[in-house]
Amino acid sequence: MDTIKFDTIESAVEDIRQGKLVIVIDDEDRENEGDFIAAADHVTTEMINFITREARGLLCVAVTMERARELQLDPMVQRNTSQHETNFTVSVDAIAEGVTTGISVYDRATTIKMLGDPASHADSFSRPGHIFPLRAMDGGVLRRVGHTEAAVDLARLAGCSPVGLLCEILHDDGSMARLPELLKFKEKFGLKLITIKDLVAYRMQRNKLVERAVESKLPTAYGEFGLIAYESFIDHHNHMAFVKGDVSSGEPVLVRVHSQCATGDTFASLRCDCGNQLASALRMIEKEGRGVLVYLMQEGRGIGLINKLKAYNLQDEGFDTVEANEQLGFKADLRDYGIGAQILQDLGVRKMRLLTNNPKKVIGLEGYGLEIVERLPLEIAPNEVNQFYLETKRDKMGHMISCSCHKGH
């Protein structure tokens, strides 16, 4: 996609401000699809008619978490197993004069506009309906690089209510339209075509999810590091960066993005390999003489300490680590790397040699404009307690582990 001349984010925002549609495409490593996106404030019957005729996808409306709470838009399901964690709520129709079955272009346009109208309330809608709201993560594309977050971000940047219409664009044969077809759409209808990657870069230059709170020095058993504490504007958690040497020179930097594991990092739990990975990463950075370890407060792959301990109990009953999370209603891995990416950007890191076995982490960081020039494994020899855990991460979560684990169990 780098050889294609995409439109600027500024030009797309101006079109949305003027009530026009834009085409937004995401990364080839993710859904690799294009969506029509517009601000809910400017939706018309003509626009809905055009979208249903030309795009043929599902009409959805992206709303903020706050707006979803105001309108009591509850999750469509309690256990979301969507591949890309698309956060659907229960579908709705507007309760308003002239709205009948909810399916006409007038009915759907009215529902969409009312979802963005601050005067609307929970009782303004019937459930289920013909419009599908989606809850965007707080922080937008800086937290999740999806069309849902892009729709909210673009509407907000255009000075509209942070509620956006989006619809996937399908090919004539019903398959997903990819970049060549989307370029034809752009030329045929005179629409702007932008990428979520460019929107992330635009917001990274203008908006911050974290700020430096304090800097200090920390002598450790592995060496002395500069320690920088960050405060998140989104969840108000404190995250840390252990820094060795000059990491802002432009040369590739040895990097580890490590999520908190109190049981492993602090108490040397044998259930996981987290504590040993943390120690190994710090040793490797010290030996290198230059590098960063970002420590994110995402306990238990994002489910928190209490739920992690509940998952331990389920594992003792015979469930593996993925099944235990699913039994509790969670995806196998709820971590996001937007905050970690902003910390690395703040430190001046642009190219990295990433210490990880996790392919999701590679994709997650690359989505924020950071170049991973090399992936280095961080393998820990299994013990009799965590061998099945490591096998599960390899076999079910795609972790690139080539340790002396044996398939089975």
Curated annotation (Swiss-Prot):
SUPFAM superfamilies: RibA-like (SSF142695), YrdC/RibB (SSF55821). Residues 206-409 are annotated as: GTP cyclohydrolase II. Its EC number is 4.1.99.12, 3.5.4.25. Transmembrane segments: none annotated. Residues 1-205 are annotated as: DHBP synthase. It catalyses: D-ribulose 5-phosphate = (2S)-2-hydroxy-3-oxobutyl phosphate + formate + H(+); GTP + 4 H2O = 2,5-diamino-6-hydroxy-4-(5-phosphoribosylamino)-pyrimidine + formate + 2 phosphate + 3 H(+). GTP binds at R256, V257, H258, S259, Q260, Q277, E299, G300, R301, T321, T356, K361. Catalyzes the conversion of D-ribulose 5-phosphate to formate and 3,4-dihydroxy-2-butanone 4-phosphate. Catalyzes the conversion of GTP to 2,5-diamino-6-ribosylamino-4(3H)-pyrimidinone 5'-phosphate (DARP), formate and pyrophosphate. This is Riboflavin biosynthesis protein RibBA.
